[in-house]
Curated annotation (Swiss-Prot):
One of its GO terms (cellular component) is axonemal microtubule. Microtubule inner protein (MIP) part of the dynein-decorated doublet microtubules (DMTs) in cilia and flagellar axoneme. Plays a key role in the assembly or attachment of the inner dynein arm to microtubules in sperm flagella and tracheal cilia. Forms filamentous polymers in the walls of ciliary and flagellar microtubules. Ubiquitinated, leading to its degradation. Deubiquitinated by USP16, promoting its stability. Tyrosine phosphorylated. It holds the Pfam family Tektin. InterPro entries: Tektin-like, Tektins. The keyword Ubl conjugation applies. It is found in: Cytoplasm, Cytoskeleton, Cilium axoneme; Cytoplasm, Cytoskeleton, Flagellum axoneme; Cytoplasm, Cytoskeleton, Microtubule organizing center. This is Tektin-2. The lineage of its organism: Eukaryota, Metazoa, Chordata, Craniata, Vertebrata.
Length: 430
């Protein structure tokens, strides 16, 4: 009888085999179902994520485009604002320069007014008077100083506002430059796609950078810069109008004062010429009267000498008749007549001597008054010359410098002319 040469392996039951086959089949179906479910979910997920990514990329591309449009609109607004601001800065600078030129132009009227006051300091004696001309000249100096003060204030305001506009311009430039950089970055982002060579994963790209701002803060910042620039440009326009008005008003005030001063000068010159003519007429009449009086004195002296000769004759006759002898020494009619003649001659001579003394006193008085008249004529001549020089000097205010030719000799002028203490005191009092 034959025997097995190997040990038999463990045997499974048929039911176990069938169960195992069933389980394998069932598990295979379940795994296939699960795999199918996973495949379907993966497909759905892939489709959904693909769609989501497409829409997200489309939305963000749209947002980028809209953001670029928004930033570009603000950039264009800032462009216009900067252009307007540059134009306003130039206009205000021109207005400031015009005010500075007008301020510089006030030096000539001031110099002329001070020169006229200085010239009139050379008046002499009674002509050193506080007349309307001096009052107008002092008023002119006061008006010029006031106009210079007004213009200087406007120049200072323009300078300060120019500094403010420059500061605003720098702020706008900075904002404009930032927006240009932003547009460049966002346009670069908008141009990127899946095939772009320079795309890559970044380290923590979702981080919030330091000093980030909200959209509201961003909008308010740019709007504030724009509104501030517009407000300051409006203020600059008002300042330019105020500068133009100040220039016009100061020029009108100065021109009106110049006309008033020159009218007073002409009136004073006519008055002075009238007094001068009157004095010359008085001098002529006084000289004629002196000549006539001197002639009368000579005739009085000649008559007095003749009367003395007549007196000598009468004295000699009376003295000679005292030498008659004896009874011939008679007091006859001849003696009485000679005595009467002597008395009459002595009275006449005394009267004539008194009249001669009165005439000589009158002549002395005429000579003294003539000296006063001639001294006053010299003063008036000097004053007329000085006022004529002043009028000639004032022609510089209406005649261009290149065409100005002095009509009379004038004093050498200095740049920094100062008033006398008397004039300074008068200016302070006014």
């Amino acid at each position: 009888m034959a025997t097995l040469s190997f040990k038999p392996s463990e045997r499974y039951r048929l039911s176990d085999w069938r169960t195992n086959s069933y389980l394998l089949s069932t598990n295979a179906e379940r795994q296939r179902d699960a795999s199918h479910q996973i495949r379907q979910e993966a497909r759905i997920l892939r489709n959904e994520t693909n769609n989501q990514i497409v829409w997200d990329e489309h939305d963000n591309r749209t947002r980028l485009a809209e953001r670029i449009d928004t930033v570009n609109r603000w950039k264009e607004t800032l462009d216009k604002c900067l252009t307007d601001l540059d134009a306003e800065i130039d206009s205000l600078a021109q207005a400031k320069e015009s005010a500075e030129q007008n301020l510089q132009a006030k030096n000539l009227p001031l110099d002329v007014a001070i020169e006229c006051l200085t010239l009139r300091e050379s008046r002499r004696d009674i002509d050193v008077v506080r007349d309307p001309v001096e009052e107008e000249l002092l008023k002119e100096v006061e008006v010029i100083e006031a106009t210079k003060k007004v213009l200087q204030e406007k120049i200072s305001q323009a300078f300060q506002h120019l500094c403010l506009l420059q500061e605003i311009r720098q702020q706008l430039n900075s904002d404009h430059r930032d927006k240009m950089e932003t547009l460049e970055i966002d346009r670069g982002c908008l141009s990127l796609n899946l095939t772009s060579p320079n795309i890559s994963l970044k380290v923590n790209p979702t981080r919030i950078p330091k000093d980030s701002t909200t959209l509201q803060q961003w909008d308010e910042f740019t709007r504030f810069n724009k509104n501030r620039a517009e407000a300051e440009m409006k203020a600059s326009i008002e300042l330019r109008e105020a500068i133009a008005l100040a220039i016009a008003q100061t020029n009108n005030e100065l021109d009106a004062q110049r006309v008033a001063t020159e009218f007073t000068f002409r009136k004073r010159l006519r008055e002075m010429e009238s007094f001068y003519s009157e004095l010359k007429w008085q001098e002529k009449n006084t000289l004629e009267e002196i000549a006539e009086l001197q002639g009368d004195i000579r005739r009085l002296e000649e008559d007095l000498r003749r009367k003395m000769m007549n007196l000598k004759l009468a004295h000699t006759r009376l003295e000679s008749r005292t030498y008659r002898s004896n009874v011939e020494l008679c007091r006859d009619q001849t003696q009485y007549g000679l005595i009467d003649e002597v008395h009459q001659l002595e009275a006449t001579i005394n009267t004539m001597k008194q009249k001669l003394a009165q005439t000589q006193n009158a002549l002395d008085a005429l000579f003294k008054h003539l000296a006063r008249i001639q001294a006053d004529i010299a003063c008036k001549t000097n004053t007329l010359l000085l006022d004529t020089k002043c009028m000639d000097t004032r022609r510089k205010l209406t005649v261009p410098a290149e065409k100005f030719v002095p009509q009379v000799d004038t004093f050498t002028r200095t740049t920094n002319r100062t008033l006398s203490p008397l004039k300074i005191c008068q200016l302070e009092l006014t």
